[in-house]
């Protein structure tokens, strides 16, 4: 079986972890990891918001799936657009890793204690708009590159800190580099942050059945709510967007955020309901955000206004 993935250190680590679990479950299975270069890997010097963001890191991998070049794709769920190409499916959703963002800084242990004017790097509009709301006195620096490249900027003193996803840091075994795990109450994660997606062709039902041992039902419900939220806002929405769903017992709570491209406006909402209503809850949260000012932000986006 051929498994398609990006070639970054994090993507390969994630894919090897999945491959190891598959090999443990099916010792006789022959596995081959196929590295596929994506548009996001090629266009490294352009801010993600300017080149479309969603889908940039998976398009070529999905094309390989559809062409039969690979049988299974391993993605970060947060890179997946709200709508999948016809003929593809999310075959399995493993248990979620830490969904939080983290601060890695050479000058301070906590975000609240950073000095005014500190230079903090991030490659995400979602993070930028929330950071500016939290600490408008900081200088937020746009940042591209792989995880190790971003962290190196701090070590080289080019930046006072970077904010990145905890999941990638943990999967790489770099948790000791973290100076603060930022609570989701302060910074909402991206849709699907911390979750891996195992994508296959819809026709490969036997393969989907074989991946069932990797499925985590709670994570699937949480991600289903988050992706319903994203879908209602518009799958290709380039506004800063965040959503995080948490299941506790039979209750599913989902919090969401939408911001403006100029990073000066941020709207947040929260709702909860039955775990059986994941899609409805995500959709309803998006509706509330749209009614609370998000629709105006989308209209400004269509008109070319910041």
Curated annotation (Swiss-Prot):
E.C. no: 2.5.1.61
Record keywords: Porphyrin biosynthesis, Transferase
Pathway: Porphyrin-containing compound metabolism; protoporphyrin-IX biosynthesis; coproporphyrinogen-III from 5-aminolevulinate: step 2/4
InterPro entries: HemC, Porphobilin_deaminase_N, Porphobilinogen_deaminase_C, Porphobilinogen_deaminase_C_sf
Co-factor binding comment: Binds 1 dipyrromethane group covalently.
Pfam families in alphabetical order: Porphobil_deam, Porphobil_deamC
Modification S-(dipyrrolylmethanemethyl)cysteine occurs at: 237
Superkingdom to which the source organism belongs: Bacteria
Biological process (GO), any one: protoporphyrinogen IX biosynthetic process
GO MF term list: hydroxymethylbilane synthase activity
Cofactor: dipyrromethane
The reaction(s) this protein catalyses: 4 porphobilinogen + H2O = hydroxymethylbilane + 4 NH4(+)
One GO cellular component, as annotated: cytoplasm
Further comment: The porphobilinogen subunits are added to the dipyrromethane group.
Subunit structure: Monomer.
Biological role stated in the UniProt entry: Tetrapolymerization of the monopyrrole PBG into the hydroxymethylbilane pre-uroporphyrinogen in several discrete steps.
Family: Belongs to the HMBS family.
Protein name: Porphobilinogen deaminase
Source organism of this protein record: Syntrophus aciditrophicus (strain SB)
Organism lineage string: Bacteria, Pseudomonadati, Thermodesulfobacteriota, Syntrophia, Syntrophales
């Amino acid at each position: 079986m051929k498994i398609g993935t990006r070639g970054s250190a994090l993507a390969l680590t994630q894919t090897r972890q999945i491959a190891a679990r598959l090999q443990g479950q099916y010792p006789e299975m022959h596995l081959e990891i196929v590295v596929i270069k994506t548009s996001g890997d090629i266009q490294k010097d352009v801010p993600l918001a300017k080149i479309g963001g969603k889908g940039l890191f998976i398009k070529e991998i999905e094309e390989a799936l559809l062409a039969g070049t690979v049988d299974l794709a391993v993605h970060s769920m947060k890179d997946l657009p709200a709508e999948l190409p016809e003929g593809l499916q999310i075959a399995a959703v493993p248990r979620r890793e830490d969904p939080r963002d983290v601060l890695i800084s050479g000058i301070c242990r906590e975000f609240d204690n950073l000095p005014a004017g500190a230079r903090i790097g991030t490659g995400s509009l979602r993070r930028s708009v929330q950071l500016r709301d939290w600490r408008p006195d900081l200088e937020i620096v746009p940042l591209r590159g792989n995880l190790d490249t971003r962290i190196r900027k701090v070590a080289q003193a080019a930046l006072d800190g970077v904010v990145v996803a905890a999941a990638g840091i943990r999967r790489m075994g770099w948790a000791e580099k973290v100076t603060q795990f930022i609570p989701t109450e302060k910074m909402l994660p991206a849709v699907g942050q911390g979750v891996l997606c195992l994508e296959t062709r819809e026709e490969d039902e036997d393969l989907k059945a074989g991946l069932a041992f990797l499925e985590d039902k709670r994570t699937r419900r949480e991600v289903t709510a988050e992706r319903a939220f994203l879908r209602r806002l518009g799958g290709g929405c380039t506004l800063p967007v965040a959503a995080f769903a948490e299941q506790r017992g039979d209750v599913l709570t989902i919090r969401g955020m939408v911001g403006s491209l100029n990073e000066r406006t941020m709207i947040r909402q929260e709702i909860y309901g039955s775990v059986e209503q994941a899609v409805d809850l995500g959709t309803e949260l998006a509706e509330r955000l749209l009614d609370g000012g998000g629709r105006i932000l989308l209209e400004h986006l269509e008109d070319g206004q910041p």
